[in-house]
A protein has these predicted regions:
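Residues that line or immediately flank small-molecule/substrate-binding pockets and catalytic motifs
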Residues: 83, 179, 246, 303-306, ...
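Aromatic-rich peripheral "rim/lid" segments of glycoside hydrolase catalytic domains that contact
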Residues: 283-377, 383, 390-391, 396-407
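Active-site mouth of glycoside hydrolases
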Residues: 1-229
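Feature marks short, surface-exposed loop/turn motifs that line or immediately flank catalytic pockets
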Residues: 20, 85-89, 127, 181, ...
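Residues embedded in well-ordered beta-strands within globular domains across many folds
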Residues: 80, 176, 300, 383, ...
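Short, polar loop/linker segments at the starts of domains and inter-domain junctions
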Residues: 13, 20-33, 256-259, 390-404
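Extracytoplasmic
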Residues: 354-543
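Extracellular glycoside hydrolase catalytic/binding regions
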Residues: 156-160, 164-303, 316-320
Length: 543
């Protein structure tokens, strides 16, 4: 639920501010790249009294009961609630808590209980800033939490207050601590031991109050480096895990997760993908998330609601008011400031855009995230587990560099030539896996999990020079056994449907294997001949 209590510029329709923190160079916060600077612009354009009341309205309008109800209806069972310390603990001498913020959170937790949606309370923006990037709501791009003894103590006190208030709230599934610490900084090696100290002391102090709830600890560098979780962080209760973040830059295969999965096994702890997404990355999403599910790791899409064009996989999008540019032009480009009255009207209009019924729902994500309804699975996105769910017989690693250990022939489609750097090509993120096919010969097979509970058809797209004998089964029950005819491959120069700087995948023939009711694991095996498969196509709409 990004933007709700911890706004970020790129999700607001302003600026991202994700600039590199260069060694020895001070990097102040942007004019409107985080909640702290958004508050400053509010005070400049609308006045202090308006700004103070605005935040109460913002938090209650950005996340409403209807948001939680819709989230539940769509099949999701948890919501991550990113909070900023400054919303709950006033930034002034002494310890004074913002009771309105706690009242607001209490309402959200009540809705979560009503709709059976677990809440993961995410300490996204710690006191003084822990990340060095705008999402930590710091005053600049430093990581002052680790250097400032008072700020660290205030963070401990705030977390202890959460434990006191919510130790008996069963709907809280976990505490996510602390978001993306020590990212984009040359001080990572220096600060990592201080982060370890913070985690160890945090858990010791919190456990004196709350012995029940799970703590999910983030690695450094955008929650991706987890090597320092090499010992027990919760020695008395052993109720902790790792929160990992991964987007489409990460190759969707077990090898990408091997290090953290091994750590989790060694420490006997759980893994949770606390942030993931990838705008229009349906093939990536349905492949990566199934791998996570197979290894019993939950995942959380970033994020639920953002401004249109934010560039992340949000379920809901809202449009900014027509005159929003007057605020951003003033804040970022130095244009004339609207009058107080005019600016207040613009901000009021912004609040009106946040309601669920004013948003556009991006329903295309649901089928790929949940594997229900109408969706496609890339043939190369076959199940990783159990180990006998797939069998390749090649004596050479495939030439694409993807899933090298499975002994399958993965081949580029006709006419496609990847850039020299392959999957790590410079510039805009390329999608060579969209142009890779799974070649199956006699005795080879692959499996795919389908979670649609009603009736649907199963098809494949493929090409084959000659007839190929295939058997397809779901949960051991034969769906199809017979001959698929020769099929061609139409080379295309069309623009990719999602990525304007790439060509679309080639067109393959589609062959319907049959109709089935209920979820299960689809196994496709070639009995004789050879075929190259592009997609597994599931259509509830064609039953």
């Amino acid at each position: 639920m990004g933007n709700w209590d911890n706004p970020e510029g790129f999700m607001l329709g302003t600026q991202s501010g994700f600039g590199l923190f260069e060694p020895g160079k001070y990097a102040p916060m942007g004019r409107m790249d985080r909640g702290r600077s958004m508050d400053q612009i509010l005070r400049e354009t609308c006045g202090t009294k308006y700004a103070e009341e605005f935040w109460k309205r913002w938090r209650r309008l950005y996340l409403t009961e209807e948001d939680i109800a819709l989230l539940s209806r769509r099949g999701y069972n948890s919501v991550r609630l990113p909070i900023r310390a400054g919303s709950f603990l006033y930034e002034e001498p002494g310890i004074t808590y913002n009771e309105d913020s706690f009242a607001m959170l209490n309402d959200v937790l009540d809705w979560c209980e009503t709709y059976q949606v677990y809440a993961v309370v995410d300490f996204h923006a710690a006191t003084a800033g822990q990340s060095g990037i705008p999402c930590d709501d710091g005053v600049d791009n430093g990581q002052h939490l680790y250097d400032d003894e008072e700020s660290m103590e205030r963070m401990f006190l705030l977390m202890e207050e959460f434990m006191r208030r919510y130790k008996d709230r069963w709907i809280i599934g976990a505490y996510d601590c602390i978001n993306e610490p020590i990212s984009m900084t040359p001080r990572r090696e220096e600060l990592t031991p201080k982060l370890v100290y913070f985690y160890e002391k945090m858990i010791r102090r919190c456990r004196k109050i709350d012995q029940k709830h799970l703590f999910l600890l983030n690695g450094t560098q955008f929650s991706s480096l987890t090597y320092f979780f090499d010992h027990e962080f919760d020695p008395e209760y052993h109720n902790w895990g790792i929160s990992l973040h991964a987007y489409e830059m990460v190759v969707p295969e077990v090898a990408s997760l091997a290090s953290v999965l091994r750590t989790c096994r060694e420490q006997k702890i759980c893994l949770w993908m606390g942030e993931t997404g990838g705008r229009n990355e349906h093939a990536w999403q349905t492949t990566m998330y199934e791998i996570l599910a197979e290894y019993h790791a939950g995942y959380n899409l970033w994020c639920w609601k953002t401004v249109e064009g934010a560039g992340c996989a949000s379920i809901l999008n809202f449009n900014v008011p027509d005159e929003w540019h007057l605020i951003t032009d003033y804040a970022i480009n130095g244009a004339a400031k609207p009058s107080y009255e005019h600016a207040q009207a613009i901000w009021d209009s912004y609040l009106e855009c946040l309601a669920v019924d004013k948003c556009k729902e991006n329903t295309q994500y649901h089928p790929y995230l949940l594997r229900e309804g109408d969706f496609e699975i890339p043939a190369i996105g076959y199940n990783a587990l159990p180990m006998d769910s797939h069998r390749g017989l090649s004596d050479l690693p495939n030439a694409t560099g993807y899933r090298l250990y499975d002994r399958f022939e993965l081949v580029y489609e006709k006419g496609y030539h990847p850039e020299p750097a392959g999957f790590a090509a410079p510039g805009p993120i390329k999608h060579p896996r969209d142009h890779v096919q799974l070649q199956l010969g006699a005795g080879e097979y692959a499996s795919y999990t389908i979670r649609e509970k009603e009736t649907y058809t199963v098809s494949v797209t493929y090409c084959a020079d000659k007839e190929v004998k295939v058997q397809a089964a779901i949960q051991g029950e034969t769906l199809f056994e017979g001959v698929m005819p020769p099929a061609g491959e139409k080379v295309t120069s069309d623009v990719h449907p999602y990525f304007a700087y790439e060509t679309a995948p080639n067109t393959l023939e589609r062959f319907t294997l049959g109709t089935v009711t209920g979820e299960g694991i689809l196994k496709i095996e070639v009995l004789d001949g050879c075929a190259r498969f592009g997609q597994i196509v599931i259509r509830k709409s064609e039953k």
